[in-house]
Amino acid sequence: MINIWTEKYRPKRLDDVIGEDENINTLKSFVKNGDLPHLIFAGPAGTGKTSTAIALTIELFGDDWKENFLELNASDERGIDIIRNNIKDFAKIRPSNKLGFKIIFLDEADQLTNEAQAALRRTMEMFYSTTRFIFSCNYSSKIIPPIQSRCVVLRFRPLDKEAMERKLREIAKNEKFDIDDDSLDAIYEISDGDMRKAINVMQAIQSTGEIKPSKIYEISGEINKNEYKNLISLSLNGAFSDAKSLLDKMLVDYGLSGIDIIRGMHSAIRNERIANRQKLEILIALAEFEFRISQGGSDNVQMDALLARISYIGSEIT
């Protein structure tokens, strides 16, 4: 039976959570006091929101944590029924633990409709004596103000390179295989601070027995950031035919969408040494053509036009 590494290496205690010292210290103070407010965990995917919620529950309830923890995903059941049924059924049963409350963890809470959130706000008030809510979301701004005002908001950030690579080395050592710096750099670039994605990529590459950057990009369906830099550079310097060939390779051989490529270009251009005005115009163009594609424009037509725009920027703007 294959162990899923993201579960195998999920933090079991708050001290095991990496890269979120301020948030962890705040949660430890709640544990020490034996009480908990409603919480909002806000941040991108893979930043440890679910793992932190589980570690917090284990700290509070010990071996009985599963009896006192309900995890639901709002994106699976977006309507108001999730509030009336699953949550109310769990909340109305009085807890048997000494703290006197249970925890409901609602993942992707920003996917709930406003109507469902309003119903949830009433449920929070009705069952506060027995239930605490932890809302996990990408954007706290999508949680209605009446819920936000009843919660402590903790913001989770993508893991920095040093912390991620330290954890990946620890996993590699435990799994008894070697991984070099270049491969770790490739995993970090692909995951962009998402620890869950990084661990999944490393497990996938370890299973192939071929641990090297090129294989990492291949198995993850990603390409090296330098390819995006080359695409921008070729276009900017007027080598339109070469840029078009590279674009076709990305679209056909790598199977990337136009929006994938635009977002890769956006990430790549941030630290490029390009004249400020040129960089400004390119960023505006990236936003414009991403919008065009999102509204139904053809990937091929719009991406060709984007390269032409960047070529124009290179020739006319200094």
From Swiss-Prot:
Entry binding sites for ATP: G43, P44, A45, G46, T47, G48, K49, T50
SUPFAM superfamilies referenced in this protein's UniProt entry, alphabetically: P-loop containing nucleoside triphosphate hydrolases (SSF52540), post-AAA+ oligomerization domain-like (SSF48019)
Signal peptide extent: none
One GO CC term, this protein: DNA replication factor C complex
Alphabetized Pfam families for the sequence: AAA, RCF1-5-like_lid, Rep_fac_C
GO aspect biological process, one term: DNA repair
Domain of life from the UniProt record: Archaea
Record keywords: ATP-binding, DNA replication, Nucleotide-binding
Entry GO MF terms: ATP binding; ATP hydrolysis activity; DNA binding; DNA clamp loader activity
Quaternary state and interactors: Heteromultimer composed of small subunits (RfcS) and large subunits (RfcL).
Matches recorded under PANTHER family: REPLICATION FACTOR C / DNA POLYMERASE III GAMMA-TAU SUBUNIT, REPLICATION FACTOR C SUBUNIT 4
Similarity comment: family membership: Belongs to the activator 1 small subunits family. RfcS subfamily.
Role: Part of the RFC clamp loader complex which loads the PCNA sliding clamp onto DNA.
Protein name: Replication factor C small subunit
Organism of this sequence: Picrophilus torridus (strain ATCC 700027 / DSM 9790 / JCM 10055 / NBRC 100828 / KAW 2/3)
Lineage: Archaea, Methanobacteriati, Thermoplasmatota, Thermoplasmata, Thermoplasmatales
